[in-house]
């Protein structure tokens, strides 16, 4: 593989010295870019775009051509695993994901296959290999998966949800069934992420989008427990260097200490968390990624720069911070805003790394 020219993202995740704070944006390959919308139109629909390695590579690289980002992230979806398990994933026009065969019974859980990453999910690995080749060592490639809890919410609810009544009914009325499902999903995620690493991903991230809807004990038992299992099962070194692992629970600020005990290298934090406090709590164990509210990108360039400066000041001196948004970028932000954001981070962070 080509030698890496810019490794400050990987170094920051391992809390090693860097010259400036690295940055990438969740959903940086996405609908806010006109070139993404054009490529998606060529593909026909979202999953066709994910399944075409050349087009998935193209949209992964698009934001890097516009902005001096410090990492690329695989263009894919967290629901590839349940889709490969045969649940019948579809995306309606203007709608979220839907599953034709939601999980409701013991038999349904028992019958779920664990997908072969080089079989039903080979299209993802082909995309990883293609992107890694086309990056030519410019920046590292991030692979990812949804967390078992977050995948289970979609599989049991049959799609997106606001109240999560079906999966919470299973959690409280039949916890053993939910544990069986989560355990199987954890095994599937371990295989999937390790295959991404073998295919060329240089860092991996677990997105626990819906962990924050759980109560305290339930989060530890039904979400974090299974992320811990995944972290323990991952390949942690490849191509002669460490493969850092980042956990991100949206709304998970109260569990940072417990998350840091999993053996991961970094924690993603959303905008509800003060970075100075997070660093004081867990900065001796893990790096932190985040955490600007994506809605700040609707503001003026001066306001964006002000927010960047504030977050950099919150983290303070030293390595161990990857700048990011607190969640995915919105599709209708002004076209110049991401450039202001990225350039401000690189410019204003340098004094913190002397």
From Swiss-Prot:
GO terms for molecular function: uroporphyrinogen decarboxylase activity. Pathway: Porphyrin-containing compound metabolism; protoporphyrin-IX biosynthesis; coproporphyrinogen-III from 5-aminolevulinate: step 4/4. One of its GO terms (biological process) is protoporphyrinogen IX biosynthetic process from glutamate. Keywords: Cytoplasm, Decarboxylase, Lyase, Porphyrin biosynthesis. The record marks 77 as: Transition state stabilizer. Its EC number is 4.1.1.37. It catalyses: uroporphyrinogen III + 4 H(+) = coproporphyrinogen III + 4 CO2. One of its GO terms (cellular component) is cytosol. Catalyzes the decarboxylation of four acetate groups of uroporphyrinogen-III to yield coproporphyrinogen-III. Homodimer. This is Uroporphyrinogen decarboxylase.
